[in-house]
Regions:
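Single conserved hydrophobic/aromatic residue that forms the stacking wall/gate
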Residues: 1-11, 209-216
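Short, Lys/Arg-enriched N-terminal segments with co-localized hydrophobic residues
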Residues: 10-24
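Non-transmembrane, aqueous-exposed alpha-helical and coiled segments at domain scale
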Residues: 24-208, 212
């Protein structure tokens, strides 16, 4: 019952009793510093007794090292917990989804005999585009001695676009093709203004962008 779950969750010292009485435990791991607190290692440890692992934000600029029976791994985009067959790993809508990097990281696991993990990606996750990485690099060069020391992974330009509402969500790849083309053209126009007048770099060429039929 709901009352049983509330009572047993208050009793933190008796998790087994909570589970026997039908209680569901949700654990949130949040870093309160500037990173490197050990979030990934803690998540990997808790994943052993969890059914679902959710990464809710961040991108491939982050990193955590996991050592297990398969070897030593440095994960950057995949959620901790991908090494457990019983878990489902979810990439949430706050994640900077670098699709080529995600595929590369999955392959790096299976190449070392790790079973293919069960992965779900939110259709509202926003896609990190190649020009985000380029803009990150250009901005660091422009700032020169006053640069922020970016990892040049495109994270700052990505989140700037996200909150300016000019990014691309996963669901848009499966929506109306004409609307997607029009949005791409509008975004390219905005980006080219910055490329030409602020960074003095080659412009984005819309004619080179090809939209393929997505695999469902």
């Amino acid at each position: 019952s709901r009352r049983q779950r509330q009572m047993c969750i208050r009793d933190r010292a008796d998790i087994d009793k909570c589970q026997r009485n039908g209680g569901n435990m949700v654990k949130a791991i949040v870093g309160a510093n500037w990173g490197d607190e050990g979030k990934g290692k803690i998540t990997d440890m808790l994943a052993e007794e969890s059914d679902i692992i959710v990464r809710f934000q961040g991108g491939s600029n982050a990193g955590h090292t996991i050592i297990n029976e398969y070897g030593k791994f440095a994960l950057h985009l995949l959620p901790s917990g991908v090494f457990y067959n019983h878990t489902t790993s979810i990439i949430g809508n706050g994640v900077a989804l670098n699709i080529p990097y995600l595929i590369k990281e999955l392959k790096s696991l299976t190449d070392r005999n790790v079973p293919m993990p069960k992965i779900l990606v939110s259709d509202r996750a926003q896609i990190l585009m190649p020009y985000h990485v380029a803009f990150d690099t250009y901005e660091e060069a422009r700032l020169a001695g006053k640069s922020f020391g970016s990892t040049k992974s495109g994270i700052a330009p990505f989140y700037s676009d996200k909150y300016a509402k000019i990014g691309f969500q996963v669901n848009e790849l499966f929506g109306d093709e004409q609307e997607l083309k029009e949005k791409i053209a509008n975004v390219c126009t905005l980006k080219n203004v910055m490329l030409e007048h602020l960074y003095h770099q080659p412009l984005l060429n819309l004619s080179l962008i090809h939209i393929s039929e997505p695999t469902r």
